[in-house]
Amino acid sequence: MSQSFDVAVIGGGPGGYVAAIRAAQLGFSTVCVDAFKNPQGKPSLGGTCLNVGCIPSKALLQSSENYHAVQHDFADHGITVANTQIDIGKMLERKNGIISKNAAGIAFLFKKNKVANVHGLGKLVGRQNEKWLIEVTDGGETQQIEATHVIVATGSNPRPLPGVEVDNVRVLDNAGALALDQIPARLGVIGAGVIGLEMGS
């Protein structure tokens, strides 16, 4: 038997989770369907922006800016720091901690506002009795949800380039670039969106 809601939001990124919370605050029974899994294979709300986009790139950018300030700017303030080193593992650990805290914060807001959260890939499959039918697949399991209103907030994915395989070794997507454990000597960035520009920084 299908679970029934007033509003179903497909996508748990910044557009989706905010819409779901607001719908619930306005008194609609609301569910958010999201398929994202973190590198450990666990569901993680927040979409590309939080998990493999704007937030982690800003965290790493801040670490890089701090390193640059120690190397080049602190002396102007009368602060001398010797033997400054980069610990990329620690930088990545900090970045991952920021992601985890923010994802947990979204889950808390869902609970506080009574937004149901279903993990899996949501797909509109039709209408029945004035309601939209949504099939949610997670691994080998499928369930059905019905909702009077549907908000599609599925975000984006990196665009594949013809004849170029993303192996996350030499050719990286945003997720691979944000997990690099060594600083590359050279890096070419294709794309001038927010993530691309921050990678170039």
PLM segments and residue spans:
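Glycine-rich flavin
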Residues: 2-5, 21-28, 32-183
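N-terminal Rossmann-like FAD-binding beta1-loop-alpha1 element of flavoenzymes
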Residues: 7-32, 196-201
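Hydrophobic residues in beta-strands of the RecA-like P-loop NTPase core, especially within AAA+ ATPase
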Residues: 10, 33, 153, 189-190
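Acidic, glycine-rich active-site loops and adjacent beta-strand->loop/helix elements
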Residues: 13, 36-38, 193
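Conserved G/P- and acidic residue-centered "switch" motifs that form tight phosphate/ATP-binding loops
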Residues: 13-16, 114, 191
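Rossmann-like NAD(P)H-binding beta-loop-alpha module
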Residues: 181-201
